[in-house]
Amino acid sequence: MENLNTTSTAALTGMTKQENDASYAVLLIADFTSIIGCTLVLLGFWRLKLLRNHITKIITFFCSTSLAKDLISTILTLIEKKQSNGSFQCYLYATVITYGSLACWLWTLCLSFSIYNLIVKREPEPEKFEKYYHVFCWVVPFIMSVIMLSKGVIEVTGNWCWIGNTYVGYRFGLFYGPFLAIWFLAAVLVGLTSRYTYKVIRSSVSDNKDRHMTYQFKLINYIIVFLLCWVFAVINRIVNGLNMFPAWVSILHTYLSVSHGFYASVTFIYNNPLMWRYLASIILIPFTKFGYFVETQQRLEKNKNNNNHSPVGLSNNAQNNNHHHNHNNNHNNNHNNHNNNNNNNNSDFVNNDSSNYYTASMIESFSVQNENSKSINGADNFKQNGASQQDDKDSPNSNNNNNNNNNNNNNNNNNNNNNNNNNNYNNKDIEPIDNCNTNSIPMDNIATRIEIPPQHPTLTPQQSLQEINLNDDDNKINTHQSNKKKDSNV
């Protein structure tokens, strides 16, 4: 912002008129891009219900704070051309910078703590910390702003009003000191989280290491953005304290610090496939009116509620998973039909959905459901279902009812498989949606899906599944033959 006049501003900053004009233009560009980025994130969170969870609440508060700060700053930059030290506009500008920046930093720290709490500590109720977050993120900046206003240290400092160049102690005590402390704590929390997930990755037998490295990057990219956007601000203030005012450092300070909201928004969008598919499908709509990107827009539109990674077309992994899933369903149906022919003679058989067991036991999501205290993996469900059915095996009436239900379920499974095959044929561009509760945190918000090794260490997942089904067949046949022998002896 141009304050007082060009000559006095240049004298205060040590920059020429051309350098000061360039800094002013950079400031406006940074303000507008930050406003656009935060608005897009808030729009996406408002429109996409799958993104409404504890983590995205924190991101929403960060973007809301940054948006309010940038809006007020932009208005003051555009309308207040001639300010003087001690004016209301000058004090307002300084307060907006101090309060808004500190609040954004603290929300970033809360985001780091929440991710650590969810992944490492497996906190079942992360929402209980939100009230403390609000007190922490709103009260601390307020205290710092009140101290700044009460000390009379606000002056015109170039493109904005803030703590004067001669008050280096107040600058670092009220602003850059807390910044360094917040960044250090956030980096420690992210480091502990990354170390934990890295150990899980190393202990797995998954070959998909590249994808896991992508998840690792998503855990730390927002803290990298946090550092890069403010590192030149720290450098510039240290240099200013030495009575030096290099123009290029000041311009980088202006652009990056004001653009923190924009780059943080880009990071949040990148970490959420749901978000960028939704936004990309909207952005491409005008181009489709002229015949451009029609197929791409249609694919993004179909997959905008899909939390998988590849937005355009069906990836090879997705195709293999679809083929494997359909093969398992067909195998299970044949297996269930064979079981139903012997249910009257064999009451000890337990009907299980092997494909669900395989899917749930091989993939674990580090997500905490809103209504459940702990996430239960597929293997636990498998055991619980088996135990509950074993408890009912001694009742003849329940056996007859179970046989009828099994027959109906098999018919439904056959119909569902036919429908699935038709859907896969007709919707080749739609990727399979992850098998997760919609109330749980989307995996790509915090990038923490870790594959669990197969139950048998020497078999592939496909062989493990076949072994499960073959063992069930053998157990059923052996039991059936033993029952026949008992009947013949009688």
Curated annotation (Swiss-Prot):
GO terms for biological process: adenylate cyclase-activating G protein-coupled cAMP receptor signaling pathway; adenylate cyclase-activating G protein-coupled receptor signaling pathway; aggregation involved in sorocarp development; cGMP-mediated signaling; chemotaxis. GO terms for molecular function: adenylate cyclase activator activity; cAMP binding; cAMP receptor activity; G protein-coupled receptor activity; GTPase activator activity. PROSITE patterns: G_PROTEIN_RECEP_F2_4. Residues 305-319, 373-389 have a biased composition (Polar residues). Pfam families: Dicty_CAR. Its main location: membrane. One of its GO terms (cellular component) is plasma membrane. Residues 329-346, 397-427 have a biased composition (Low complexity). Keywords: G-protein coupled receptor, Glycoprotein, Membrane, Phosphoprotein, Receptor, Transducer, Transmembrane, Transmembrane helix. The keyword Transmembrane helix applies. Glycans are attached at residues 5, 85. The keyword Calcium does not apply. Residues 1-23, 79-94, 151-173, 236-246 are extracellular. Residues 44-57, 121-131, 193-216, 272-490 are cytoplasmic. InterPro entries: GCR1-cAMP_receptor, GPCR_2-like_7TM, GPCR_cAMP. The chain crosses the membrane at residues 24-43, 58-78, 95-120, 132-150, 174-192, 217-235, 247-271. It is found in: Membrane. C-terminal Ser or Thr residues may be phosphorylated. Residues 303-353, 373-437 are annotated as: Disordered. The modification Phosphoserine is found at residue 204. It is a multi-pass membrane protein. Belongs to the G-protein coupled receptor 5 family. Receptor for cAMP. Coordinates the aggregation of individual cells into a multicellular organism and regulates the expression of a large number of developmentally regulated genes. The activity of this receptor is mediated by G proteins. This is Cyclic AMP receptor 3. The gene is carC.
